[in-house]
Amino acid sequence: MENLQKMISEKSVVIFSKNSCCMSHTIKTLFLDLGVNPTIYELDEISRGKEIEHALAQLGCSPTVPVVFIGGQLVGGANQVMSLHLNRSLVPMLKRAGALWL
């Protein structure tokens, strides 16, 4: 989906989320606490949310929310992001993508 690729590549950190998902809330809070200002797309609030969710599933994202892209690259869902954070790889990745300066 061309629109999805554009959404992913426009910002250094992009999160696809749903307001009703507790793991989405956890991931958004983590990035905000780290000082990152991610672009967040709430799939249950935007008109093409189901279409975007289907496109994420075709990329192999399961579950389809939350899904995080850093520097235009798929990082994955909550498990992958938390693993990167716990092994101290997330912050360097964010710095390389220009999402963090400190």
Curated annotation (Swiss-Prot):
Q: What is its main location?
A: cytoplasm
Q: Which family does it belong to?
A: Belongs to the glutaredoxin family. CC-type subfamily.
Its keywords, alphabetically, are: 2Fe-2S, Cytoplasm, Iron, Iron-sulfur, Metal-binding, Nucleus, Redox-active center
The answer on whether this UniProt entry bears the keyword Iron reads: yes
Under the heading PROSITE patterns, the entry gives: GLUTAREDOXIN_2
Q: Which GO terms describe its biological process?
A: response to nitrate
User: What is the scientific name of the source organism?
Assistant: Arabidopsis thaliana (Mouse-ear cress)
The answer to whether keyword Metal-binding applies is yes
Please give the function described in this protein's UniProt entry. Answer: May only reduce GSH-thiol disulfides, but not protein disulfides.
Task: Kindly list the GO CC terms recorded for this protein.
Answer: cytoplasm; nucleus
Identify one Pfam family in the record.
Glutaredoxin
Record's subcellular location: Cytoplasm; Nucleus
Q: Where is this motif: Responsive for interaction with TGA factors?
A: 99-102
InterPro entries per record: GlrX-like_pln_2, Glutaredoxin, Glutaredoxin_subgr, Thioredoxin-like_sf
Q: Which gene encodes it?
A: GRXS3
UniProt binding sites for [2Fe-2S] cluster: C21
GO molecular function list? 2 iron, 2 sulfur cluster binding; metal ion binding
What protein does this entry describe?
Answer: Monothiol glutaredoxin-S3
Glutaredoxin domain ranges (all copies): 1-101
